[in-house]
Amino acid sequence: MRDFMDYIQLAFYDASKWNRDNSYSQLTTTANALLDFSTPERLKVNLSSLSTPHFATTYTLGTVGLIDGSISYLFTTIPLHDTPSRSTLIPLRKLVPGYRQIYPPSLPPAFPAADGRDGDLAIGGTEGDLKKKATLLHATLHLPPPTTLTGSFLRRLSPTTQLSLAFCSSRAPASKSAPQATLVTQILYDTGKYNSEFLFSTDNALFGFKGLWNFGPDPRKQNQNGGDPAREPCRSLLSLLSAGGEVYYSPVSSVVGLSTGLRFTTLPAATENPHSTFPYTLTLTLTPLTGSMSTTYSLLASPNLAFSSRFGFNVYSWESEMVAGCELWRRSKKLHTLQRNSSPLFAVDDLTWARRKMGLQDAAVSVHSERDDLPGIQRYDHDMHHHTQRPHASDSVIKVRVDQSWNIRALWEGRVKELVVSAGIALGPKSRSSLSYASSLAASGPGAAGGLSSYGWKSVGVSVLYSS
């Protein structure tokens, strides 16, 4: 589950019209959300509030074994009037990342004119907000010692350029020396056709560059021609192929990093009609220096069910990795019955939706025309992209993932009264201590030497969020 501050930061991106999907850093977002989700390891309580449209606070307290906490503050120059802040109103899909629908590349708002001048209108603003830059400030203080202070600064320099500063400062409990600090600076440039990121970190003077290129029509040329072919039915894009890479170099430690990747995904135009393909995303990433490669395949089997798998292989060590996971969104029977009775839009269930994707007829819903069902699919895809609250907001979600070593993680997230609760468990093989191993040999004899590990619980935890 995302932290409340991460949720507010995503709302800032939406309000400033910044496309966070068009980035090499987000190449495997869908697979990571379905396969690499974390489970709570103890009891954690979060109290948050969006006290004004510009200011948010969060207080966190963790317990069980170690008591710690944090205090966070966030300020943005863009008013977040349309952002739900109460825990009972926040759509659960905003707090729980899952399968993410990618949309065709588009121009940032107020894109520079043909003569190269930037638009004067502020991002997300009105005529009275001329020359006002979208800015976000965020700081978090982690207590008790070792005290750590983290923060970030975001500023929209132009419709296509964004500046990001992130710092981390920590100090050991008994140390009298100056706190150690690290500053990471990023400049992001997005034209819709391609995205580039320049990075510098004070830790070992690390320099980095990331880039992503989208194959297909150029949104900049479409803007100059006064049209957008992606919006025309006869020329709608059905899929998107993106290629990118990243490179890092540190002159201090002589460290070099390099990776490249591909992503192929279906677009809404390929899945918005009843007889079409299932939405899916394929990725391939390569790290030549370490000899690692990884492929992922994610499928949206229904509006409430998604599957994902990943296979990794190292050509130097011949080690491999296999991971599979899924997520299932659920709605309460009372809410589901109310939706079915209020509008025919929700009369088509997940099984019927899947049947139509496979081209199978269902007599039970033949009374509804394709035109009646089409807005439902379009509206669903639109909501997945813009994260707007709709009556079909889910009540809970179950996530499960397992790898080739039978490490299993299960997560349930949902609402309990006015709280958003996240509960998870982790199971897997555990190495025995030398003492327990010696005792097992003495009790069972040499024949028990094969039992070097046992299987059991790794962690169990609960996280609770309340916001106002």
Curated annotation (Swiss-Prot):
Transmembrane feature ranges: none
Protein name as annotated: Mitochondrial distribution and morphology protein 10
GO cellular component: ERMES complex; SAM complex
Organism encoding this protein: Blastomyces gilchristii (strain SLH14081) (Blastomyces dermatitidis)
Role played: Component of the ERMES/MDM complex, which serves as a molecular tether to connect the endoplasmic reticulum and mitochondria. Components of this complex are involved in the control of mitochondrial shape and protein biogenesis and may function in phospholipid exchange. MDM10 is involved in the late assembly steps of the general translocase of the mitochondrial outer membrane (TOM complex). Functions in the TOM40-specific route of the assembly of outer membrane beta-barrel proteins, including the association of TOM40 with the receptor TOM22 and small TOM proteins.
Membrane topology value: Multi-pass membrane protein
Alphabetical keyword list: Membrane, Mitochondrion, Mitochondrion outer membrane, Transmembrane, Transmembrane beta strand
Main location: mitochondrion
Domain comment (free text): Lacks alpha-helical transmembrane segments, suggesting that it resides in the membrane via beta-sheet conformations similar to those predicted for other outer membrane proteins and porin.
Stated family: Belongs to the MDM10 family.
Gene that this sequence comes from: MDM10
Keyword Mitochondrion: yes
One Pfam family this sequence matches: MDM10
Any Gene Ontology biological process: protein insertion into mitochondrial outer membrane
PANTHER family: MITOCHONDRIAL DISTRIBUTION AND MORPHOLOGY PROTEIN 10 (PTHR28035:SF1)
The UniProt record lists the keyword Transmembrane: yes
Subunit structure: Component of the ER-mitochondria encounter structure (ERMES) or MDM complex, composed of MMM1, MDM10, MDM12 and MDM34. Associates with the mitochondrial outer membrane sorting assembly machinery SAM(core) complex.
Domain of life: Eukaryota
InterPro entries on file: Mdm10
Cellular compartment(s): Mitochondrion outer membrane
